[in-house]
UniProtKB/Swiss-Prot annotation:
Its EC number is 7.1.1.-. PROSITE patterns: COMPLEX1_ND1_2. Signal peptide: none annotated. This is NADH-quinone oxidoreductase subunit H. Its main location: membrane.
Length: 363
């Protein structure tokens, strides 16, 4: 399947290059659209899946109309886009509009270094991991700006909570990725996946030797995206809707889109860093060439990556339906007193495992 896709892309790339400088610009725009459009569509269907799955957990049907519920999210988007963006008279007009854009931009920019397969990546950067850390940290600036520009006590309190929460869990996430970097010997995301390849299938993945770091990264990812049970940033029962309380229409939709795009992104990154990305869990167990449509089951491919992502994306929904919201002090205590010390200890353990050959790079 990958070869068929590449056979279509390569001639198209050469045709654009033949157009000169304008063709290079058009090709860059096309690559951006090839990332942005699928992400937007994925968010739409993810919202439908969330409402449907929570409905089943609550023993009800969930969305049933608008194309049997499939196109419910698209109907919601059209509703929001046609609503007026109301600005409080005391707000900072320019910053009020810039804030949702500043939140959305990093959420989309981070996708440029995410590999979907060995060859399906927009930019195979050698500093991809560092780039991701930078991009995922920038989104909080839009939230802080929204809280300040709204000139609302609830919005400002939500923004301050977000800043403290992101700073707290960004440290734990960064330390967890230091362990991944030590185990793989690279900060290139594709090389991190290749480091988990081998003849033992899922036993070669970093999930087993780096399991504590996997748990820390997963939970910290939930906290970074401000999702339940860490959604004190927009806690409805406490501060109405936090930094989004004054936003409506398309501006609110941009915050919503950024949040769900980040949730899908974190699901991808967990799969890449700890579960072998596109690698098959039975890779190396079967050596057969039957058909390109079947061989991916044991050779690996993007369908495996999407299945792993689907699991973690669904886990976000499961957390929301199952766990109550933590108190703010409990969230801070978990980040500073549990996760950060645990990651520091396991970085040392990981270094020892690499030194003594317990963790070996893939073939």
């Amino acid at each position: 399947m990958n070869e068929l896709l590449l056979n279509l892309v390569d001639p198209l790339h050469q045709w654009f290059l033949g157009l000169g400088d304008g063709g290079v610009v058009l090709w860059s725009v096309l690559k951006i659209l090839l990332i942005a459009v699928p992400v937007i569509v994925s968010v739409a269907f993810y919202v439908v899946w969330e409402r449907k799955l929570i409905g089943w957990m609550h023993v009800r049907h969930g969305p049933m109309y608008v194309g049997m519920g499939i196109f419910q999210a698209f109907a919601d988007v059209f509703k929001l886009l046609f609503k007026e963006i109301l600005q409080p008279s005391s707000s900072h007009k320019a910053m009020f509009i810039i804030a949702p854009l500043l939140t959305l931009a990093p959420a989309f920019a981070a996708w440029s270094v995410v590999p979907f397969d060995a060859k399906l990546v927009l930019s195979n950067a050698n500093v991809g991991l560092l780039y991701l850390l930078a991009m995922t940290s920038l989104g909080v600036y839009g939230i802080i700006l929204a809280g300040w520009a709204s000139n609302s006590k609830y919005a400002f309190l939500g923004a301050m909570r977000s800043a403290a929460q992101v700073v707290s869990y960004e440290i734990a996430m960064g330390f967890a990725l230091v362990g991944v970097m030590i185990a793989s010997g690279s900060v290139n995301l594709s090389q991190i996946v290749f480091a988990q390849a081998g003849n033992s299938g899922f036993f070669d993945w970093f999930l087993i030797p780096l399991f504590p770091l996997f748990i820390v990264y997963w939970v910290s990812g939930v906290a970074e995206t401000n999702r339940a049970p860490f959604d004190v940033v927009e806690g409805e029962s406490e501060i109405v809707a936090g930094h989004m309380v004054e936003y409506s229409g398309g501006a609110f939709a941009l915050f919503f889109l950024a949040e769900y795009a980040n949730m899908i992104l974190v699901s991808f990154l967990i799969s890449i860093f700890f579960l072998g990305g596109w690698l098959s869990p039975i890779q190396g167990w079967v050596n057969a060439d039957i058909s390109p449509w079947i061989d991916w089951l044991w050779k690996g491919g993007w369908p495996w990556l999407l299945m792993k992502v689907f699991f973690f994306a669904s886990a976000y929904i499961w957390f929301r339906a199952s766990f109550p919201r933590y108190r703010y002090d409990q969230i801070m205590r978990l980040g500073w007193k549990v996760f950060i010390p645990l990651t520091i200890v396991w970085i040392a353990v990981t270094a020892l495992m690499v030194f003594y050959g317990v963790i070996q790079k893939g073939v």
